[in-house]
């Protein structure tokens, strides 16, 4: 199989993998409301945290990151070039954002994008996760943390392994574009802060 054919095959596979909505499936499995119609309406880990608690959100985060990491890392093992790896990672994110299996109504693609970046190295994964966590703790805005971390990601990559700076910049651009409405709400002071759903106390 030619390099072009292999790349196209992996792009399709990545999109289909990304189209599996972890948030919707985890909520169904746990008897929670559909995240597309509750909370912020975004089927992602942050909204699942709001409506279902930390354990459900952690499951969604793990599987959303896995959707980005697996196809990208497999493509890397196949010897696919860096720019094509970026396209494959973007395909996984587009699957998450516009999932063919769930009516093309998906999430922001942040966890999937960070998952696609993670195989570059443990040091990059730690930098990304630490940046996001610290920014959320300081600001209480998941969207702001995602935007700033996306802006930092190409700089981290250039510093740690500059071969993948362009693919990471491609993913960062997608994340920022996807957050355009959040940016408008942040500027207006209307963005929702992160808060975990409080369960009723048992008498």
From Swiss-Prot:
GO cellular component: plasma membrane
Keyword field: Cell inner membrane, Cell membrane, Lipid biosynthesis, Lipid metabolism, Membrane, Phospholipid biosynthesis, Phospholipid metabolism, Transferase, Transmembrane, Transmembrane helix
Keyword Cytoplasm attached: no
Subcellular location: Cell inner membrane
UniProt cross-references to SMART domains, sorted A to Z: G3P_acyltransf
Membrane topology (UniProt): Multi-pass membrane protein
Domain of life according to the entry: Bacteria
GO molecular function: acyl-phosphate glycerol-3-phosphate acyltransferase activity
A GO BP entry: phospholipid biosynthetic process
Transmembrane segments: 6-26, 82-102, 118-138, 141-161
Pathway(s) annotated for this protein in UniProt: Lipid metabolism; phospholipid metabolism
Main location (coarse class): membrane
EC number: 2.3.1.275
Pfam family, any one: G3P_acyltransf
Family classification: Belongs to the PlsY family.
Function: Catalyzes the transfer of an acyl group from acyl-phosphate (acyl-PO(4)) to glycerol-3-phosphate (G3P) to form lysophosphatidic acid (LPA). This enzyme utilizes acyl-phosphate as fatty acyl donor, but not acyl-CoA or acyl-ACP.
Subunit structure: Probably interacts with PlsX.
Protein name: Glycerol-3-phosphate acyltransferase
Annotated gene: plsY
């Amino acid at each position: 199989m030619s390099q072009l054919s292999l790349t196209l095959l992996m792009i399709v596979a990545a999109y289909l993998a990304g189209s599996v909505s972890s948030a919707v499936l985890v909520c169904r499995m746990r008897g929670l409301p559909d995240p597309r119609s509750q909370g912020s309406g975004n089927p992602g880990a942050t909204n699942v945290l709001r409506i279902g608690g930390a354990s459900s959100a952690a499951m969604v985060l793990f599987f959303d990151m896995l959707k980005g990491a697996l196809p990208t890392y497999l493509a890397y093992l196949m010897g696919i070039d860096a720019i094509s790896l970026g396209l494959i990672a973007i395909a996984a994110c587009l699957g998450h954002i516009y999932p063919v299996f769930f009516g093309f109504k998906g999430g922001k693609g942040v966890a999937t994008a960070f998952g696609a970046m993670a195989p570059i190295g443990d040091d990059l994964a730690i930098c990304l996760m630490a940046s996001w966590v610290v920014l959320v703790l300081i600001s209480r805005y998941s969207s702001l943390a995602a935007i700033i971390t996306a802006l930092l990601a190409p700089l981290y990559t250039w510093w740690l392994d500059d071969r993948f700076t362009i693919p990471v910049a491609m993913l960062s651009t997608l994340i920022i574009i996807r957050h355009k409405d959040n940016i408008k709400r942040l500027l207006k002071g209307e963005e929702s802060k992160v808060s975990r759903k409080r369960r009723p106390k048992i008498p």
